[in-house]
């Protein structure tokens, strides 16, 4: 029996959305449940790749948190080359260089206001606590949170 194939998500930022708007994204590993990220050999490399893209203005990362089999991030993207291309290239680099296997595609949600931004920030930081991986958010080591978290201007 063939399983249904999920539709491919477009990840195109509409023209009416301001460039530099924040997006909540989730990227999952394949297979689910396998700890590919929260280990010294890959966790630091994934966070370093996130930081590299931030520092080179490929994207603007407000927060990235690694979980054993997925990551959550709040990122702003330039209109060109666009979210889909940027994330695809980043996943390809991390997979090729560090052996992380990703699921096809990723989830994104545009954060429409400051309330949503703060809500998703709290959700991300509390994720390892909810999963009983640590007692307090500040105890979780697999986080990239740059000092410059202001919205970008490309």
Label the predicted regions.
Residues 1-154:
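Short catalytic/metal-binding and nucleic-acid-binding patches
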